[in-house]
């Protein structure tokens, strides 16, 4: 929908993406402005501008991976709209009692709805923060008897419900299936969950449905035998999806491989046929597992992801730490692509015309590497230098912000605190916690399904959260202790 909108409005893809990101950065800067309400107006404006600049010039926003024509290009901005809306609402509920909250709730709802529709894992990332913020602010509003503001807390969830129902209705109208996605929910997810139930002799962590489990399933479910040829014998399928090191399909590629095999067999002739087919597969596998005909290692599941087990915990924790360090250092944030495009001239022309945006298809003479002019290389060098400096500063500041916030917690435990003290502390704690949650989510997928290495593309929503945490945390709690003692004297 985003690409179609840009095409209809004749907006260049890269320009529109940058505008979306800058809009989110501006909203976030104004969202946190109540924190410096006691500063002189000119100082407050400087702080707001500084936060906007820190977000707008994030190296992750121009990284080659995040500039791809892909849903993750806009996902960080959509998430930032959501977090900015919730933060702006929470801070105004405490510090600006005469200001309406609904505009901030509407902004949060727009970010939540669009983010949820953009990525299937957005609910696990955004909804915990939304729920916690809503409960905390609701307690504050009830205590102050602000009933209209309390009732307005439903706005983000109502917008999310309307957005999801609208898409489900459109899918039902056009395809005959009332679902938001035919991948992460419904009959295909049920079929994948059923296949992952079948026990296996393999102990390789990346394999969700190993070869020995597939052989058992083919025998128990005749409907899958037509796709077995494509999965087990077709050379092109194996080249596209099979891991040569494992000599099998990783979890992160198997579901795409079996969907393509089903497409080749005409199962995706229409959505209803595909839905019925996968539901039949799911029902037969689950029935065989329940009856003992097929060996089962889990209960009934509806999911495309691997089941969470204790075996993944050490690797997930280690990869979470790797991902967090990856974010702090702005690694893999080069603003250019090191590999030359494999697109044909006709493909590139078609995409360029649709997106109103130029593509670089030039190669260095005698090499299979992309060509960049000396001017471009100079700009890239400046941008990478900025990323290096930003990474060092962010790493130091995150450490300091965590220490100062913990010191503030210790001081709050020794005395009675008001909502003006507690809510900002909890807000920053939530922002930092949700950043770690995102790192952990991506870490689990990496160690259980993908095996592609730590990816900036999937971690890009974390960078702005750490910037918000550092900027607000150091402003609130980062004054030297000696100054605070002098103020209290």
Task: For each feature predicted by the language model, list its residue ranges.
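Short hydrophobic/aromatic helix or loop-helix immediately within or flanking a transmembrane segment
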Residues: 1-18
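Transmembrane-helix motifs of polytopic, lipid-linked glycan transferases
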Residues: 15-42, 48, 81-85
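Multi-pass, polyprenyl lipid-linked donor-dependent membrane glycosyltransferases
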Residues: 16-20, 54-86, 114-131, 459-461
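Hydrophobic, aromatic-rich transmembrane alpha-helices
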Residues: 23-34, 380-424, 478
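Membrane-interfacial entry segments at the cytosolic side of transmembrane helices
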Residues: 43-47, 98-104, 142-159, 483
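Membrane-interface transmembrane helices that cradle and orient dolichyl/undecaprenyl
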Residues: 82-103
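Membrane-interface alpha helices of multi-pass inner-membrane proteins
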Residues: 104-119, 160-167
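Juxtamembrane membrane-water interface segments immediately following transmembrane helices
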Residues: 160-316
């Amino acid at each position: 929908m985003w690409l179609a909108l840009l095409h209809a409005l004749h907006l260049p893809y890269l320009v529109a993406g940058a505008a979306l990101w800058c809009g989110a950065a501006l909203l976030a800067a104004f969202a946190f402005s109540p924190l410096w309400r006691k500063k002189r107006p000119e100082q407050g404006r400087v702080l707001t501008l500084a936060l906007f600049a820190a977000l707008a010039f994030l190296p992750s926003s121009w990284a080659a991976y995040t500039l791809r024509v892909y849903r993750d290009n806009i996902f960080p901005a959509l998430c930032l709209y959501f977090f900015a809306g919730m933060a702006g609402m929470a801070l105004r509920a405490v510090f600006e009692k005469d200001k309406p909250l609904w505009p901030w709730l509407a902004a949060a709802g727009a970010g939540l709805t669009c983010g949820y529709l953009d990525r299937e894992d957005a609910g696990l990332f955004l909804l915990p923060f939304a729920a916690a913020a809503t409960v905390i602010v609701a307690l504050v509003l009830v205590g102050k008897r602000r009933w209209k503001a309390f009732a307005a807390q439903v706005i983000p969830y109502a917008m999310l419900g309307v957005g999801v129902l609208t898409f489900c209705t459109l899918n039902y109208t056009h395809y005959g299936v009332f679902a938001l996605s035919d991948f992460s929910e419904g009959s295909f997810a049920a079929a994948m969950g059923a296949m992952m139930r079948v026990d296996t002799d393999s102990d390789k962590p990346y394999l969700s449905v190993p070869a020995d489990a597939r052989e058992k399933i083919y025998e128990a479910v005749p409907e899958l035998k037509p796709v077995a040829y494509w999965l087990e014998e077709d050379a092109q399928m194996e080249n596209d999806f099979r891991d040569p090191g494992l000599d099998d399909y990783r979890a992160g590629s198997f579901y795409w491989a079996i969907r393509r095999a089903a497409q080749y067999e005409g199962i995706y002739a229409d959505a209803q046929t595909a839905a019925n087919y996968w539901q039949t597969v799911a029902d037969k596998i689950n029935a065989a597992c329940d009856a003992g005909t097929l060996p089962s290692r889990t209960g009934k599941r509806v999911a495309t992801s691997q089941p969470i087990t204790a075996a993944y915990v050490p690797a997930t924790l280690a990869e979470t730490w790797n991902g967090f360090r990856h974010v702090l250092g702005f690694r893999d944030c080069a603003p250019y692509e090191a590999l030359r495009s494999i697109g044909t001239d006709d493909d590139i022309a078609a995409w360029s015309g649709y997106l109103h945006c130029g593509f670089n298809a030039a190669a260095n003479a005698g090499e299979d590497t992309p060509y960049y002019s000396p001017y471009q290389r100079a700009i890239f060098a400046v941008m990478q230098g900025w990323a290096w400096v930003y990474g060092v500063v962010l790493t130091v500041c995150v450490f300091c912000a965590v220490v100062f916030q913990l010191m503030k917690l210790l001081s709050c435990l020794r005395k009675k605190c008001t909502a003006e003290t507690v809510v900002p502390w909890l807000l920053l704690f939530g922002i930092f916690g949700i950043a770690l949650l995102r790192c952990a989510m991506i870490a689990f997928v990496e160690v259980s399904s993908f095996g592609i290495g730590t990816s900036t593309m999937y971690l890009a929503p974390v960078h702005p959260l750490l910037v918000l945490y550092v900027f607000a945390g150091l402003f609130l709690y980062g004054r030297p202790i000696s100054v605070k003692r002098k103020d209290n004297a």
